[in-house]
Amino acid sequence: KEGYIVNYYDGCKYPCVKLGDNDYCLRECRLRYYKSAGGYCYAFACWCTHLYEQAVVWPLPNKTCN
């Protein structure tokens, strides 16, 4: 599974500036999911890869980013 890492509180994606390989996104994806997850910056938000099927990613139901 893949998807944008999401803030559970406000429903927003984790923003990033440096597109492509990005240490911040990789670190955040691994902290949120687990160490075998990958992550990079895509369309100015952190995209996580190699997630388990039950992983919660953007968009969250009933939560819009404010």
UniProtKB/Swiss-Prot annotation:
Keyword Disulfide bond found: yes
What Gene Ontology terms describe where this protein resides (cellular component)? extracellular region
- The yes or no answer to whether the keyword Disulfide bond is present is yes
What subcellular compartments does it reside in?
Secreted
Query: Which GO molecular-function terms appear in the entry?
Result: sodium channel inhibitor activity; toxin activity
Q: Domain LCN-type CS-alpha/beta, which positions?
A: 1-66
GO BP, one annotated term: defense response
Paired cysteines (S-S): 12-65, 16-41, 25-46, 29-48
Q: Which residues form a coiled coil?
A: none
**Keywords, alphabetical:** Disulfide bond, Ion channel impairing toxin, Neurotoxin, Secreted, Toxin, Voltage-gated sodium channel impairing toxin
Do you know which InterPro entries this protein is assigned to? LCN-type_CS_alpha_beta_dom, Scorpion_toxin-like, Scorpion_toxin-like_sf, Scorpion_toxinL
* Expression tissues: Expressed by the venom gland.
According to its record, what is known about the domains? Has the structural arrangement of an alpha-helix connected to antiparallel beta-sheets by disulfide bonds (CS-alpha/beta).
- Member of which family? Belongs to the long (4 C-C) scorpion toxin superfamily. Sodium channel inhibitor family. Beta subfamily.
User: Main role?
Assistant: Beta toxins bind voltage-independently at site-4 of sodium channels (Nav) and shift the voltage of activation toward more negative potentials thereby affecting sodium channel activation and promoting spontaneous and repetitive firing. This toxin acts on human Nav1.2/SCN2A, Nav1.4/SCN4A and Nav1.6/SCN8A voltage-gated sodium channels. Also, it reduces the peak of sodium currents in Nav1.5/SCN5A at all potentials. In vivo, is lethal to mice when intraperitoneally injected at a dose of 5ug. No activity is observed when injected into crickets or woodlice.
Protein name as annotated: Beta-mammal toxin Co3
